[in-house]
Amino acid sequence: MKHNNVIPNGHFKKHWQNYVKTWFNQPARKTRRRVARQKKAVKIFPRPTAGPLRPVVHGQTLKYNMKVRTGKGFTLEELKSAGIPKKLAPTIGIAVDHRRKNRSLEGLQSNVQRLKTYKAKLVIFPRRARKVKAGDSTAEELANATQVQGDYMPIVREKHATELVKLTTEMKSVKAFDKIRLERTNKRHAGARAKRAADAEKEEKK
């Protein structure tokens, strides 16, 4: 080693230059994706380019359950409440998920309303141009129909209004986070505690 040079410290494999990942195809890939999107839009015309309608759901786990997002598909209960047969739904651009369960009335009602709004705006083309069936849209509606580009019926997240108030001693005494933790713990142990109480009762009777 001579002079004030950097000490070589490269831990390379032999012929490492043959395995370098390059991104020279990035602009072409971007163009290819764009062309593919355009081709798909033509292929699925007059259906919306964004795909089928999806429900509004709450995220899982404690971290995300306050936030809403689009789900996989509507439940059978939601479809039934909206008066849409489960076999018909996928044919008119509604995603169906038979595994999802409705755990709150509020969520069920909001998705049923979403389905009803969608159904009211829906324009159904006849399978055969000359054979118009019941439920198909009128000739005037078909003439004015256009393909929906981008997101349709997006999720509108409400911004809750906040107001400033003076803190009282009562407010300070309430520990909201601790209260939530306690309730979650009680829920988790409810079954075990009930079983223990039942066992204790049996022992007393003996």
Swiss-Prot record:
HAMAP family: Ribosomal_eL13
Gene Ontology CC terms: ribonucleoprotein complex; ribosome
Keywords: Ribonucleoprotein, Ribosomal protein
PANTHER family reported in the protein's UniProt record: 60S RIBOSOMAL PROTEIN L13 (PTHR11722:SF20)
Record field: compositional bias (Basic and acidic residues): 196-206
InterPro entries on file: Ribosomal_eL13, Ribosomal_eL13_CS
Gene3D superfamilies, A to Z: 1.20.5.110
The protein, known as: Large ribosomal subunit protein eL13z
Species of provenance: Brassica napus
